[in-house]
Protein backbone atom coordinates (compact mmCIF):
# COMPACT_ATOMS: atom_id res chain seq x y z
CA UNK A 1 0.00 0.00 0.00
CA UNK A 2 1.05 3.55 -0.58
CA UNK A 3 1.66 6.28 1.96
CA UNK A 4 -0.51 9.32 2.38
CA UNK A 5 0.68 12.38 0.47
CA UNK A 6 0.26 15.92 1.76
CA UNK A 7 0.00 19.30 0.07
CA UNK A 8 3.27 21.26 0.13
CA UNK A 9 1.34 24.55 0.27
CA UNK A 10 -1.24 23.96 3.04
CA UNK A 11 -0.37 20.52 4.52
CA UNK A 12 -3.80 18.99 3.83
CA UNK A 13 -4.10 15.46 2.49
CA UNK A 14 -3.94 14.98 -1.30
CA UNK A 15 -6.67 12.97 -3.02
CA UNK A 16 -6.55 11.14 -6.37
CA UNK A 17 -8.00 13.02 -9.32
CA UNK A 18 -8.08 12.06 -12.98
CA UNK A 19 -6.50 14.51 -15.43
CA UNK A 20 -8.59 13.82 -18.53
CA UNK A 21 -6.56 16.15 -20.76
CA UNK A 22 -3.15 14.62 -20.08
CA UNK A 23 -4.64 11.19 -19.22
CA UNK A 24 -2.69 10.82 -15.99
CA UNK A 25 -3.55 10.33 -12.35
CA UNK A 26 -2.90 13.39 -10.22
CA UNK A 27 -2.94 13.93 -6.48
CA UNK A 28 -4.83 17.14 -5.74
CA UNK A 29 -5.51 19.20 -2.65
CA UNK A 30 -9.17 19.87 -1.81
CA UNK A 31 -8.26 23.03 0.06
CA UNK A 32 -6.08 24.89 -2.47
CA UNK A 33 -5.15 24.55 -6.16
CA UNK A 34 -2.03 22.43 -5.64
CA UNK A 35 -1.73 19.12 -7.53
CA UNK A 36 1.06 16.78 -8.60
CA UNK A 37 1.35 13.75 -10.86
CA UNK A 38 0.95 10.53 -8.87
CA UNK A 39 3.98 8.24 -8.64
CA UNK A 40 1.79 5.20 -9.34
CA UNK A 41 -1.57 4.62 -10.98
CA UNK A 42 -2.82 2.46 -8.10
CA UNK A 43 -5.53 3.92 -5.89
CA UNK A 44 -6.48 2.31 -2.57
CA UNK A 45 -9.86 2.87 -0.98
CA UNK A 46 -10.24 2.33 2.75
CA UNK A 47 -13.74 2.21 4.21
CA UNK A 48 -14.11 2.22 7.96
CA UNK A 49 -17.43 1.21 9.41
CA UNK A 50 -18.51 1.46 13.00
CA UNK A 51 -21.81 1.55 14.76
CA UNK A 52 -23.62 4.80 15.51
CA UNK A 53 -23.26 4.20 19.23
CA UNK A 54 -19.46 4.19 18.84
CA UNK A 55 -19.59 7.50 16.94
CA UNK A 56 -22.09 9.20 19.24
CA UNK A 57 -21.08 10.92 22.42
CA UNK A 58 -23.80 10.19 24.94
CA UNK A 59 -24.21 12.62 27.78
CA UNK A 60 -24.42 10.98 31.18
CA UNK A 61 -27.40 13.24 31.84
CA UNK A 62 -29.37 11.93 28.84
CA UNK A 63 -31.30 9.48 31.00
CA UNK A 64 -32.54 12.31 33.26
CA UNK A 65 -33.48 14.66 30.41
CA UNK A 66 -37.26 15.20 30.71
CA UNK A 67 -37.53 16.32 27.07
CA UNK A 68 -36.39 12.98 25.63
CA UNK A 69 -39.07 10.37 24.90
CA UNK A 70 -39.07 7.19 27.00
CA UNK A 71 -39.53 3.57 26.04
CA UNK A 72 -39.91 0.23 27.80
CA UNK A 73 -37.05 -1.20 25.68
CA UNK A 74 -34.97 -3.79 27.57
CA UNK A 75 -31.34 -2.83 28.25
CA UNK A 76 -28.93 -5.51 27.00
CA UNK A 77 -26.57 -4.82 29.91
CA UNK A 78 -28.76 -4.63 33.05
CA UNK A 79 -32.05 -6.01 31.57
CA UNK A 80 -34.16 -3.19 33.03
CA UNK A 81 -37.09 -1.98 30.93
CA UNK A 82 -36.78 1.80 30.76
CA UNK A 83 -34.73 3.88 28.34
CA UNK A 84 -34.75 7.31 26.75
CA UNK A 85 -34.18 7.45 23.01
CA UNK A 86 -33.30 9.82 20.19
CA UNK A 87 -32.52 9.61 16.48
CA UNK A 88 -29.17 10.13 14.78
CA UNK A 89 -27.91 9.91 11.19
CA UNK A 90 -25.93 6.89 10.14
CA UNK A 91 -22.35 7.66 9.07
CA UNK A 92 -22.38 4.85 6.59
CA UNK A 93 -23.13 5.30 2.89
CA UNK A 94 -26.87 5.39 3.49
CA UNK A 95 -28.60 8.30 5.16
CA UNK A 96 -31.03 6.32 7.29
CA UNK A 97 -31.89 7.48 10.77
CA UNK A 98 -31.04 5.18 13.67
CA UNK A 99 -32.59 5.09 17.12
CA UNK A 100 -30.11 5.32 20.01
CA UNK A 101 -31.42 4.17 23.40
CA UNK A 102 -29.88 5.12 26.75
CA UNK A 103 -30.84 3.01 29.75
CA UNK A 104 -32.11 5.18 32.63
CA UNK A 105 -30.80 2.66 35.19
CA UNK A 106 -27.18 2.03 34.09
CA UNK A 107 -26.61 4.67 31.35
CA UNK A 108 -25.68 2.08 28.70
CA UNK A 109 -26.24 3.33 25.11
CA UNK A 110 -27.42 0.86 22.48
CA UNK A 111 -29.02 0.75 19.02
CA UNK A 112 -32.35 -0.76 18.14
CA UNK A 113 -31.78 -4.32 16.90
Swiss-Prot record:
An MF annotation (GO) of this entry: zinc ion binding
Primary location: nucleus
Region (Disordered): 54-74
Alphabetical keyword list: DNA-directed RNA polymerase, Metal-binding, Nucleus, Transcription, Zinc, Zinc-finger
Family annotation (CDD domains): Zn-ribbon_RPB9
Nucleotide-binding keyword on record: no
Assembly mode: Component of the RNA polymerase II (Pol II) complex consisting of 12 subunits.
Name assigned to this protein: DNA-directed RNA polymerase II subunit RPB9
Amino acid sequence: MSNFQYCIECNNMLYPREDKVDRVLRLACRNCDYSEIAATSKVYRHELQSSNVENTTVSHDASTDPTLPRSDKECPRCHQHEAVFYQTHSRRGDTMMTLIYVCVHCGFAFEEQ
